[in-house]
């Protein structure tokens, strides 16, 4: 693998923050910020696909977001539904596979059906995987993985002493995908907000002051360039990493 290819993250995860503040700054209702954020999603997908990123995970709706005003939650659900129906064909035409992770049980049946339809419609995509986290929380993900393993133990298919970090990781919602190499958060906040808690253990973190609707092509390329200039050590010394790169 050439050096430039090594500098490209296989998996990028993004916390899309700042939609409401973007709208408030313009004296617009909060949902206007979320609608504007769809354009940023398209831009980031384009940059990731052209750069060689294999997986992009977007934090669209957290399990804590249900605590927001009912009117805002309702508007977000309508936006999610319309975006799924509108964008599925675009993703299919661009050979992009859509996956949705999270607890779907709380969503309206119509939205759950739209999720399944969009995933089926784009299932043949081979260029790129777009993973959307909806009603997702990192703690929920670890708990559901533990429950899956507990059922295997209860059924006699697995011994407790055989449970390893690798086995638990495989039971996470993202289990069959590479771990995120880079996690980006927009909006100026410096926290991960219960997003991919297990998976981000060794991810590089990148924080942008831009609100999500303003985070487009140039901003995404800047984040990827920053990643390319970092040295990922995974517990090793700089000297060890440099020696391995030369060998």
Predicted stretch roles:
Residues 1-247:
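Flexible, compositionally biased loop and terminal segments
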